[in-house]
Amino acid sequence: MRPVSYTHLDVYKRQEYMYNDWGNDEEAADYGKIYAERGKVLAAAADRLFKLSPEGFRAFCRKNASWLDNYALFMAAKEAHGGAPWTDWESGLRRRDEIETGRFEKEHSRLVDRQKAVQFLFFRQWEALRRHTEKCGIQIIGDMPIYVAQDSADVWANPELFLLDSGGRPAWAAGVPPDGFSDAGQLWGNPCLLYTSSCM
């Protein structure tokens, strides 16, 4: 079968990624190195995207604003704070104070837009992959997670939906009791949803 590229080289320039250390094992991905190197490449691709296809990007942002705005703001804030969890950010941003959040978004608009661009590129590649696999008669099975991560845009943007303490950390955490798999049980650490009558 002919290999298909999903990297959309219209926004990626070879010289921007060919010299990065992605690892040299042909049998296994080195995710540590990929994680460390990807930011520079994605930032360059995002900056080029703004020049090449702004209308498609803007349409994507409008269509997905319900989740994209919070996600991009969260990821930009996380980057600006050196990867620290949101519970360690300054109080105004941690509590999503409207004035402080607006100030951050204005001062870091480039970071926010880059995060939106990365999502746009991902979804464009994902749709290309889905179209290709459908032509090949291959079905992709999705896995819906049952919990969200504590340090996530979901919890940061919607703390009222979770059982959290005053510092934003889980008051109750997900896990399982001891069983045949683990004598000690498992503590996953994911925050539990705050179920109310409106959730049912």
Locate predicted features:
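Conserved small/polar residues in nucleotide/adenosyl-binding loops
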Residues: 7-15, 195-200
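Active-site-proximal, well-structured secondary-structure segments within enzyme catalytic domains
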Residues: 14-194
